[in-house]
């Protein structure tokens, strides 16, 4: 009797508890993201995974804003160096919703720090780039004052750095090597001219890449090709550059000309004289329309955004960027529109690779050179080949004497073939012209 009453009571309690349970709200949805009151209703108990993901979303930190500030040493409009840097800032801002690009133009060395501090204080800049070494190096002096800001300076020959003072440069010599192959094949007189700025590590390194390409083309085709270099004295001296270009054509029978200067004068002379021009830094036909492929045989394009993207990616991951960033054709990034682009590449009228060779020039270039351009480009993209590793470096006896690093005597083999030079050596100690170059007074 007592046992029966007990069982009846127990049944009533169980039924009541089931009714109450069916009326109560589920406990898991109460922990779902409170910041999203319009979130979907809780999933049935059979799908518990959905309910356990929401708390992680609720605690996810917001993406920190990044303000990329570039200090340009020159004006932007109509320039290949600062123009390419400005394009880089715009492309990065297009790619990342949390990245803003700001800039200053015509920044002198004594202005780089005041401009930087102004952009940090008033516009939230946390990456500040000096796009030339002579006006980027002063930023090193304030790096300790702003530990949360990454300062960047382009390398000319000084590779000093700090945890938040980053040095960078692209391996433009790789694209210049490909240009040299094309130039060496195109010349009919056997004379190629370079209008150059002044002896410095950056100029010597870039010229060496071009020269090695010329010599490889000459060897493959059984030609004797000379490269004549004359210095203007600075990067932007339009009249001096014009005079040098005319001298190279008139006195040295140059029929292919290029430059390591910044004015359009050498291109103007090439157009007037009816010879081939090889461009630098940007696709001057496709980007600016300065000329046509009837004069510009090929150019190369520098994508500084690939370098700066390394810094942005590190910051977004909460990491410190590398202190020296020296990337080449093996490195790339995807733009906002899905385009994959290399750090540097030969480019002409919007076309890349062997397609960048002028349609007018292409029939004049033997197929074995076209094939070699394609092969070497693909090998460099894969990181399997590099002209500076492949070739020996033998001194011409000319170049730039540096403190503790005089120009090696003519005929001195400084680097053997197959030896990979260090990044530090290439960026700061490569101070001699390669054997066979004609450096004019």
Q: What annotation goes with each model-predicted range?
A:
Residues 21-32:
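Bacterial lipoprotein signal-peptidase II cleavage site
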Residues 1-10:
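Bacterial N-terminal signal peptides that target proteins for export
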